[in-house]
Design a protein with these regions (language model features):
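Helix-breaking motifs and short loop linkers at transmembrane-helix boundaries and internal kinks
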Residues: 35, 67, 88-94, 226, ...
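Conserved MFS/SLC helix-loop-helix module at the cytosolic interface between two early adjacent transmembrane helices
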Residues: 53-90, 254
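Paired small-residue
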Residues: 82, 93-102, 284-292
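Cytoplasmic helix-loop-helix junction between adjacent transmembrane helices
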Residues: 98-137
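Helix-loop-helix hairpin linking two adjacent transmembrane segments in secondary transporters
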Residues: 123-176
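C-terminal membrane-cytosol helix-exit motif in multi-pass small-molecule transporters
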Residues: 164-183, 361-368
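C-terminal transmembrane helical hairpin of 12-TM major facilitator-type secondary transporters
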Residues: 260-304
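A late C-terminal transmembrane helix in Major Facilitator Superfamily
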Residues: 314-344
Length: 379
């Protein structure tokens, strides 16, 4: 297997989350360029996430029909074209069009790359391989605001120029030869089996109540401790940094003790940590608890991905696509659910998602009996 293509497979995990978050730190600059407010410029985040999360309901299955290698290459080309449009955009609507195309392209790369990781990884090392991919995704999410801000010292458009170059390079390199080339035509409904939907629902609740509630922590850091924007950002970064560092360890645990166990424990402990971050009176403790939650959120992500990819034979890309779609939809809807609750009672706003994370994923992931072909990874 080409080492370059294998490296490109994991690098693709960085590009998607990086593209989604690259404008988060440069909203004032984007708004100033187009004569709109920073709030209006924030639509560049929604404009990416909506097509990304909604298209993933079907993109994995469609990509499987066309062949993962071909579909991922075309998606990278589309991503590069979209990034060029963003870099040269002459108005906010033009930028939003480019962002929407970026999100649509990433809706194909994310699930198909995950399925490709499962295809090339030895069965006994699936968790570790998915952990490495998850660490790259966490790195993209964590460093996108920093790199976008650095680019904005010259012009925010340079961030999109860099994304163009990376996407074009990944399109040229392609995927490892072991990745399936297509030939099957799985029906869309094959990705919507009851077991997959249970995993997707667990991801919806767990990620919406853990990875998707950084805004709650930011609000508390400002209201309870008086931290400024830069200080709040530094504390919040701890979640992503710990997720990067611990993802490989999480993958090792998946291989040793089982994906189901890791996902359930990750959600339960993550819920407890979130409750502590909403209750305890020390800013240092809150920061430490939030950083630790990054590790346990990765246990949920890697565990769910391993569960679906280790047992789904006919349409793994479609199944993991549905799980990922619901995961990101949970994060997108989290502010709508919990910000109004925070304004009513900050403590309740932390305890409600903490309670949901403690109970719902564990119930949905409760073993329903042995399945044919069950392996240690699926325990």
């Amino acid at each position: 297997m080409s080492r370059l293509r294998l490296a490109a497979l994991y690098a693709g995990g960085f590009l998607g989350p990086f593209g989604g978050a690259m404008t988060s730190s440069v909203l004032p600059e984007v708004g100033a360029d187009f004569g709109v407010s920073a709030g209006a410029a924030a639509s560049t985040l929604t404009g990416y996430m909506l097509p990304f999360s909604l298209l993933m309901l079907v993109s994995g299955t469609l990509g499987g029909r066309w062949g993962a290698v071909r579909a991922v290459r075309l998606a990278y080309v589309a991503y590069a074209v979209a990034s060029v449009l963003c870099a040269v955009s002459w108005s906010l609507p033009a930028l939003l069009a480019g962002r929407a195309l970026q999100g649509a392209a990433n809706a194909f790369t994310t699930p198909l790359l995950l399925a490709a990781v499962a295809a090339v990884a030895p069965r006994e090392r699936l968790g570790r391989s998915l952990g490495l991919f998850a660490s790259m995704q966490a790195a993209g999410q964590t460093f996108a605001p920093l790199l976008g801000g650095v680019a904005a010292e010259v012009s925010w458009r340079w961030a999109f120029a860099g994304a163009t170059a990376v996407a074009a390079a990944l399109a040229l390199i392609g995927l490892p030869a072991a990745v399936p080339r297509g030939g099957q035509r799985p029906p869309l409904r094959s990705a919507w089996r009851p077991r997959t939907l249970r995993l997707a629902a667990a991801g919806f609740v767990a990620w919406g109540c853990l990875g998707g509630v950084s805004f709650l922590v930011a609000l508390r850091l400002g209201d309870s401790f008086g931290l400024g924007a830069g200080q709040r950002g530094l504390v919040l970064t701890g979640f992503g940094l710990v997720a990067i560092v611990t993802a490989r360890l999480t993958g090792w645990l998946v291989d040793r003790v089982g994906a189901r166990w890791c996902a359930r424990v990750g959600a339960v402990v993550g819920g407890l940590l979130l409750a502590g971050a909403g209750v305890l009176p020390s800013v240092v403790v809150v920061g430490a608890l939030w950083a630790a939650a990054g590790a346990f959120s990765q246990a949920v992500v890697v565990g769910l991905n391993a569960l679906v990819l280790s047992t789904e034979e006919g349409n793994p890309g479609g199944a993991v696509s549905v799980v990922q779609s619901l995961r990101f939809l949970g994060a997108a809807l989290s502010p709508l659910a919990f910000v109004p609750l925070y304004h009513l009672d900050p403590l309740t706003a932390f305890l409600v998602p903490a309670a949901l994370a403690l109970t719902v994923p564990a119930a949905l992931l409760h073993p329903t009996g042995a399945r044919p072909g069950t392996t240690p990874v699926t325990r």
